[in-house]
Amino acid sequence: MVLTLLFSAYKLCRFFIMSGPRPGADRLTVPGPDRSGGTSPWWAAGGRGSREVSPGVGTEVQGALERSLPELQQALSELKQASAAQAVGAGLAEVFQLVEEAWLLPAVGREVAQGLCDAIRLDGGLDLLLRLLQAPELETRVQAARLLEQILVAENRDRVARIGLGVILNLSKEREPVELARSVAGILEHMFKHSEETCQRLVAAGGLDAVLYWCRRTDPALLRHCALALANCALHGGQTVQRCMVEKRAAEWLFPLAFSKEDELLRLHACLAVAVLATNKEVEREVEHSGTLALVEPLVASLDPGRFARCLVDASDTSQGRGPDDLQSLVLLLDSSRLEAQCIGAFYLCAEAAIKSLQGKTKVFSDIGAIQSLKRLVSYSTNGTTSTLAKRALRLLGEEVPRRILPCVASWKEAEVQTWLQQIGFSQYCENFRDQQVDGDLLLRLTDEELQTDLGMKSSITRKRFFRELTELKTFASYATCDRSNLADWLGSLDPRFRQYTYGLVSCGLDRSLLHRVSEQQLLEDCGIRLGVHRTRILSAAREMLHSPLPCTGGKPSGDTPDVFISYRRNSGSQLASLLKVHLQLHGFSVFIDVEKLEAGKFEDKLIQSVMAARNFVLVLSAGALDKCMQDHECKDWVHKEIVTALSCSKNIVPIIDGFEWPEPQALPEDMQAVLTFNGIKWSHEYQEATIEKIIRFLQGRPSQDSSAGSDTSLEGATSMGLP
């Protein structure tokens, strides 16, 4: 106990020493190379004479580096000379502590840690770590991987990509122990950010397979790394890698991560990953089919980005927030046509705005173009969650928050047009538009010639800028008052940009049933679609639509009947329920699981209908799963209702047992006691595939209710639940 307190006091003192002012630090220059023969620190070299640095931050970074670099060099020297495993472990621990303390420094932690990480590489420490990752001692590999994960800044990722990917991939084949898996998943998380080529190499050589395998584990830190690794892979890997991720069922494996009830950070990172995948039109349908995408918007709406930002700051590996390149990737989500991508992108940028405002580094948002994208969401987004997050981010960044644009543009009066002109930066033309009495209808049908001749916009570049804004307005506008056949959404399904043509088409009296009869010349001259490629694509899709009837609302799609309904207790069974969903989907079963997205008034009806429609009823018996059913004689508990419905409909009931203790039959209401007569299968986290195979046998027509014979216990996985 005393040693623990002394060690904690030592760490606290050293933290304040590193972050405190340097004695005599009154000069604002970084010394250049010492021409008298001495050597200056490597991070100060490279200029002629002294180089000026910005006041405040530059001095703090310089001072922190001057204090910590000698300790780092000493620790690296001892590590290089160490031969015994114990000495190597002590050296790795010392270097790790120095780097971790640097990352935790407020405001300047990223710059100081960057300096230490560069020093480790330049002093040969990075190459040494790659060798230690191949050591025979497991503990050495674990510690080396833990340190490597901490120092993978951009330049170090370059080095690992050149000489160390094979080492990392060999480590990823060691699926155990969890301590090693955590760090290897963290290393892959960073390396997926390196480049599209590196992502492709990692995916092709098994790195993605390792991450997907670890998604079935229960360790929170490991699962967070997996979620972020998949998000980075999707963000930086390009469309080819995204297609490969979908083929390997990454969207399905993200479901249990996004469905977790214990870890909000994990859920958010998983939602980010699946939202990025959904932005790829080639795989969008497969991602939707996974069911994971439906979790994104409800989760984001329920969370506070300020609290999320505090969680990031409190963690050593995320305390500095994201760098400019990562932020740039998030900005791309704001420009997506998918609501889920806009929503999660706005949430992350709002949290990052909170972090950067504390650090005094908000300028990065202007540099990467985030301000305009956030303002556009505020102006045009019809989703309240997305718009609110964008407003909050702009306020944190000290930016003006624009007014929301009314979506029914065709119904605008002249005053709304004037407001829009001011908002997009064309105030100087307000008088001309007012003199010509331009309303929403005229605005949507405005031509280049009219803009130049009648409205006095002489500069062709200015007109291009104006039409860029007008195209965006047309794309986000609502045409519900004039678009009876929902032509806008059909055009948007072909390409989000095609929504801009809606008003021109409906103004000519066209709808979806007539579009295939129109010629390309009519689309050009009457409807104003100037781009020939767009005309060809629209006509081609319209003619194909003849063979695909319009969706009707009267019937129920045949695919709406699930093979399996999963019933579970939220507080103890959600993780297993989500894992079962993924495993069963991968084996071809359609699965219904309540994702808490149902409207309040329809909750009971929808659940009961789903139980009745499903062919099989899987009951997750986790710890205390039936406790709320006891004494529930009015059948108000949801699990109770689901069980009673399954029994009354004679469903094939398959109980899955995980840490469940049997109640006395008399303790349960009479209408559900029969559930205890069904044979159950004991869930094994270590042997998931074998357990799933047994579950599938129960689902494929072998009844689980058998009061005489009991169930097959050869797997050590089935448990008889018969009444005494």
UniProtKB/Swiss-Prot annotation:
This is NAD(+) hydrolase SARM1. Residues 1-27 form a transit peptide. The TIR domain mediates NAD(+) hydrolase (NADase) activity. Self-association of TIR domains is required for NADase activity. The keyword Ligase does not apply. Autoinhibited: in the inactive state, the enzymatic TIR domain is held apart by the autoinhibiting ARM repeats. NAD(+)-binding to ARM repeats maintains an inactive state by promoting interaction between ARM repeats and the TIR domain, thereby facilitating inhibition of the enzymatic TIR domain. Following activation, possibly by nicotinamide mononucleotide (NMN), auto-inhibitory interactions are released, allowing self-association of the TIR domains and subsequent activation of the NAD(+) hydrolase (NADase) activity. Self-association of TIR domains is facilitated by the octamer of SAM domains. Pfam families: SAM_2, TIR_2. Residues 703-717 have a biased composition (Polar residues). Keywords: Cell projection, Cytoplasm, Differentiation, Hydrolase, Immunity, Innate immunity, Mitochondrion, NAD, Neurogenesis, Phosphoprotein, Repeat, Synapse, Transit peptide. Belongs to the SARM1 family. It comes from Rattus norvegicus (Rat). The keyword Phosphoprotein applies. NAD(+) hydrolase, which plays a key role in axonal degeneration following injury by regulating NAD(+) metabolism. Acts as a negative regulator of MYD88- and TRIF-dependent toll-like receptor signaling pathway by promoting Wallerian degeneration, an injury-induced form of programmed subcellular death which involves degeneration of an axon distal to the injury site. InterPro entries: ARM-like (IPR011989), ARM-type_fold (IPR016024), SAM (IPR001660), SAM/pointed_sf (IPR013761), SARM1 (IPR039184), TIR_dom (IPR000157), Toll_tir_struct_dom_sf (IPR035897).
